Amino acid sequence: MRMEKTTDKPLSAGDMNDEYSRGPIDDIDCLNFFERAVQDPCCEACDTEDADEELRAKLSSFNFQPDSSPCNAKCQQTLNPLCKIDEALPAESELAPSRNGSVSEANSDTNSIASTVHDPVDSKYGGMPSLRKAKTTSYFTSSSSNNTTMRNPLKKCNTNINGLLVNGRSSSSSRQSIPELFSGACTKKKNNVLLKSETPNSEFSSNSLQHCNSRSFSLPRSRSRSSAIAIPTHLYGLEKYVSPELDTLTADPEESIERFSNNRPREISSCCPNDTGDTSSSLSHSNTSSSLNFPLGTNTNQFHQPRQPVQQQQSSKPNFGAGRKKSFIEMSLASSFAG
């Protein structure tokens, strides 16, 4: 016998479409799904199309007429198929007993849920099923949990603030404990820096005492003044520029000034002769307004500050910079005013 060799002919486009159309159902579904996703990937209807078809199928197969069977009461309490499954899950979770509760509490919950379900074919609702949304449980089941969650951050904030206050008091860089308030003071010390002011009146000192006593955040007298407001000199290395006599002025300024004037002899020199009195007043003002307090013994310059007579110094306000030499800045200011 003679075997004939079969040759495969190329298929036309119509034959290929027929073969694809006669293919299995899974291939067609995959092809349709692929084409749908490629043609319109941003369409939201593509994602919900299958769900809509399932919902229509459930509605078509749902029996809206009540049955006369004894299980009719149970069937009436079932959820409507229009409700989504994920919404019905929290309501079903209420049927299970809680960790701390008992089975009787769970049964009472089911009775309360069943009492809220109405007959879908009642005459009050027009004989149509009511589209009821299933009840969902809140995240916090009791008010005590809400109170505890609100109190915890408050406790954390309070502990953090108290810790900062304690650390600030312990790390204060004062070398001598000073009283909190003193009357008749004409100087203020903020972390080893003197701020000069005019001599206060008796009324002003009493008002300042009352105002400072009324403050709730004032430190006790035994402790030193906190450095939260002033500039910390120990951080910037400014302690070497501060005179050691500042500590003696902090306890009682008036007594320390008298002691300083008695221990250290003062040199009385006449002021430079000048035609106008404005330059002398500007010189004294520039000398008293300088904020640099160099320690004693620094040989910055041999030129001494012009001082007033002893009688005028006792009558006027005390001069704290009388015992030190003039700096280069003060000399340059004096020469600029004199010229």
UniProtKB/Swiss-Prot annotation:
It comes from the Eukaryota. The modification Phosphothreonine is found at T159. Its main location: mitochondrion. Keywords: Mitochondrion, Phosphoprotein, Stress response. Belongs to the ISF1/MBR1 family. The modification Phosphoserine is found at S177, S224, S227. Residues 136-149, 214-224, 279-293, 302-314 have a biased composition (Low complexity). GO terms for cellular component: mitochondrion. The keyword Mitochondrion applies. This is Mitochondrial biogenesis regulation protein 1. Residues 99-115, 198-213 have a biased composition (Polar residues). It is found in: Mitochondrion. Residues 1-20, 94-156, 198-224, 258-325 are annotated as: Disordered. Participates in mitochondrial biogenesis and stress response.
